Every structure is written in C-alpha cells, then in structure tokens.
C-alpha cells in the first residue's frame, strides 16, 4: 500500500474535505504494515473500497417556523460500510454539518463499531439545521420534515441512526414518532429512545461512562487508578455529563467544563448538583457555560479559552472534533499528565495526536475510548429485537465488559517491543482487520 498515492487520489476526488481526509490518513498510516502483509487485500482493491462510502443520501428539508416563514436545510445520510452489520451511527443537527464531517464520522464509526464486538456497520447523518433559539414546535416540525425522506433509507436490519450533537432524546422522540406514522410499524429503527418506548437504560450517559471505564483500564497498565485524580473535561453536553458522573463515582475530581463561550474552573470539584446543572445548561439551548459561575459561587469562568491550560492529572475532550490542537498538546504535556483521551470524535488534530504518541503519553483515540455510546445503542437494538428491557445494572455490566474487550484489542495490536502501548495504532488495526476480513469473505460488492 502506498499511503501517499492513495491520499493523492482521494484529495483529487474530494478536494477540500479536510476532516474526512485527516481521518483516512490517520488510519492508513496505522495499518500500512499490517495491510502489506496481506497481498490478497491489494488484489481486490480493499483499501480503495474501504475509504469510499457505500452510499450517500442527500436531500432537502423544507420546514416552517413559528412565524410562517419557510426554511430549507440540507439532510444527509452517509451509509459508509455495512460489512459486519446494519449501518449504525448518529444524526447531528448543527450549522457546521457538511459532507466532509459526516464522511469522517462515518469512516471512524465503521472501525469503532467493529471494536465493540457487536454486529454493526458504520454510518452517520444529519443536517445543517441548528436547534439553538428554536421552539419545541419548530424542532418538532423540522424533525418530522427530515424523517419524511430519511424513513425510506433506514430500518432495523438496514440502517439504525442514533443521536449526536443537536440530537438528544427530544429529537429522537419526534423522529421516531414520524417514522411510525409513515411506516405503520413499531420497530427498533432508532436508538436513544425514551425508556417509555423502547430505549435503554444509561444510554444518555453511556459514552461518558464507557470512556471512564477505558481510562481506568489504561491507568491500570501503569499501576494507577482514577481515585483522587483531577480531571479536566471540555464540553457540557451528554458526553461531558456522563464522563463527569462516572469520574466522580470512581473517586476522581472533575475541575472543568467548557462551551463555545469559554470554560469553567471549579477547584472544589464538579459533583452532585453541579453535574445535574450541566443538563440545565444544555437544555437551555443557549450553548454557553458562563451561567455556571453565577449558580455556584467559588467557581471561575474564563472567557474565550479552552480548559487545556488548567493543570490536571487527566484530560478528556468531550465537545467536538479537532478541539485540541498542537499548541494545546504542548500545554498539556508541560503539565506531565497521566492520561489524555479524545472522548469526542477525533477530538485532537493530527498534530496533537502525533505529539502525544511521540511523548509516549497514555493517549486514547476516539474510536476506542468513546465507543461506549454506540455499544449501548447496540444493546438497545438487542433489547428491541428480543422485546425485553434490561436493568441499569445489566446494561452497565455489559458496557463495562465491552470497554474491557476494546482495551484488550488495543493492547494486542498496539503494544510495542519497548512496552509502550500505542492505542491509536492498536485501535485502527483491530477495527480494520475485522472489517477487512468480513469484506474479503463477502466478495467484491
């Protein structure tokens, strides 16, 4: 495999798709040696097939606001790879959504889902619609309009979307209601549903919970644990909320959250009512974290900056892609942390990842450390299929087992001769080999 030639061809086909090209390059560099040991892969152009989505669906979404004005957004569904199961991946509603971002997310999702050990392919979708400042009625009308096209392309054995940025329980409910009305079928076609209509326990917290289980396993490789460690978290949505809850439960102290407006530093620790308040911030729709300072005296709001300048033992990106760059990595490395994990999808730039690995920092890539969300979505699919609902304890135990298994796969493929575990390489190779073997078995399709 010639990585540079493949990337040159991709860049010519997909100019300007920076996020997608970044994600592909990272994986290709990691798997190059292993790929070259399998000439049968080259014969069937496996890489060339793997890096292109199987299908991209694009559609207009016309809807009417509360004043009667018509708006038109763009809807997408990228069905990236279905070799090991139905396409599975979230829907994102945010003005930044474009094809490059969704292709990168779908590509990453393919390997992340493979790591979970569950039979799920990779996909991603969404729209450039923003829920910010919109009424419940407007959000409902948009979701219904979005589903009037999407329903043709999804199903419990075909493609099972979930939530992502801008798509929480409310939006999933509206989407599911419209799907049911259009198809006259009550199926497990979406995950992240409410408990009253087929959802799974701990799904909202699952990404954060799973991340802390993974970090716990990483620290254990160096004889450490989370207890009494300080933790800097970015974001204040579901991922950050779940991470803060589980970190506190495991004895750690969360000292930061952040938003587009800046970050909160709370030396006393973000626990109890403070964690619950994160949900209020999210549900306000204002996308700011400054009100936390007013609510909890003693905390400090730092305007326009990211929390990476705060000294902590553990750093977790929980907001969005590429939120931690090379300069941020230098700042973090100077603090001599125990662990860094990109709990958000591709939360670190390529430069930042390279710096962490070069410094032999304990570093967890998103496709491994944040797989708890989609793993629990897979468990929701299973519960829907067998018409049963598991207890919180049962789901949490299964999630813990899955994250332990993912960690074992990363160590198997990522441990170097000198003992350092390159989790980026390990996760990429483990996910790739499962998908590649499935594609080989199914022929050139």
Across the structure, where does each feature detected by a protein language model lie?
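Conserved active-site and cofactor/substrate-binding residues in soluble primary-metabolism enzymes
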Residues: 1, 15, 19-22, 26, ...
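Structured beta-strand/loop patches that form or line metal/cofactor-binding pockets in enzymes
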Residues: 41-71
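Rossmann-like adenosine-cofactor binding region
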Residues: 262-362, 368
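Adenosine-phosphate binding glycine-rich loop
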Residues: 2-23, 218, 333-445
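Glycine-rich phosphate/diphosphate-binding loop of Rossmann-like nucleotide-binding domains
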Residues: 191-194, 199-309
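Glycine/serine-rich phosphate-binding loop and adjoining beta1-alpha1 elements at the start
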Residues: 94, 113-227
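Flexible, glycine/charged-enriched surface loops at secondary-structure junctions
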Residues: 21, 37-44, 117, 154-163, ...
């Amino acid at each position: 495999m010639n990585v540079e030639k493949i990337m040159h061809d991709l860049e010519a086909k997909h100019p300007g798709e920076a996020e997608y090209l970044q994600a592909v390059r990272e994986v290709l560099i990691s798997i190059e040696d292993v790929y070259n040991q399998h000439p049968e892969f080259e014969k069937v152009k496996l890489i060339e097939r793997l890096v292109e989505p199987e299908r991209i669906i694009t559609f207009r979404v016309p809807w009417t606001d509360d004043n009667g004005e018509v708006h038109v957004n763009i809807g997408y569904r990228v069905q990236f790879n279905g070799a090991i199961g139905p396409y599975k991946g979230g829907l994102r509603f945010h003005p930044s959504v474009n094809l490059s971002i969704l292709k990168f997310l779908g590509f990453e999702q393919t390997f992340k889902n493979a790591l979970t050990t569950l039979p799920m392919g990779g996909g991603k979708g969404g729209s450039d619609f923003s829920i910010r400042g919109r009424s419940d009625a407007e959000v409902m009308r948009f979701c219904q309009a979005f589903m009037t096209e999407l329903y043709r392309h999804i199903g419990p054995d075909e493609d099972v979307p979930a939530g992502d940025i801008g798509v929480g329980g409310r939006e999933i409910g509206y989407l599911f209601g419209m799907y049911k009305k259009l198809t006259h079928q009550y199926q497990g076609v979406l995950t992240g549903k409410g408990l009253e209509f087929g959802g799974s326990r701990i799904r909202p917290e699952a990404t954060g919970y799973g991340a802390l289980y993974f970090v716990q396993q990483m620290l254990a490789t160096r004889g450490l644990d989370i207890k009494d460690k300080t933790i800097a978290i970015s974001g204040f949505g579901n991922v950050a909320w779940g991470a803060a809850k589980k970190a506190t439960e495991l004895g750690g102290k969360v000292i930061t959250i952040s938003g587009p407006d800046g970050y909160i530093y709370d030396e006393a620790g973000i626990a109890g009512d403070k964690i619950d308040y994160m949900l209020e911030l999210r549900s306000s729709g204002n996308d700011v974290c400054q009100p936390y300072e007013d609510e909890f005296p003693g905390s400090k709001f730092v305007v326009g900056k990211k929390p990476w300048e705060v000294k902590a033992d553990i750093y977790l990106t929980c907001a969005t892609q590429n939120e931690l760059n090379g300069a941020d990595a230098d700042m973090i490395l100077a603090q001599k942390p125990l662990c860094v994990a990109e709990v958000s999808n591709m939360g670190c730039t390529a430069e930042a990842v390279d710096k962490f690995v070069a410094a032999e920092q304990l570093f967890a890539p998103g496709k491994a450390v944040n797989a708890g969300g989609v793993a629990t979505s897979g468990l929701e699919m299973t519960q829907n299929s067998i018409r049963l609902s598991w207890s919180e304890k049962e789901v949490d135990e299964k999630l813990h087992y899955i994250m332990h298994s993912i960690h074992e796969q990363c160590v198997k493929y990522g441990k170097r001769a000198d003992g350092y575990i390159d989790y980026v390489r390990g996760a990429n190779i483990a996910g790739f080999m499962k998908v590649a073997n499935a594609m080989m078995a199914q022929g050139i399709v």
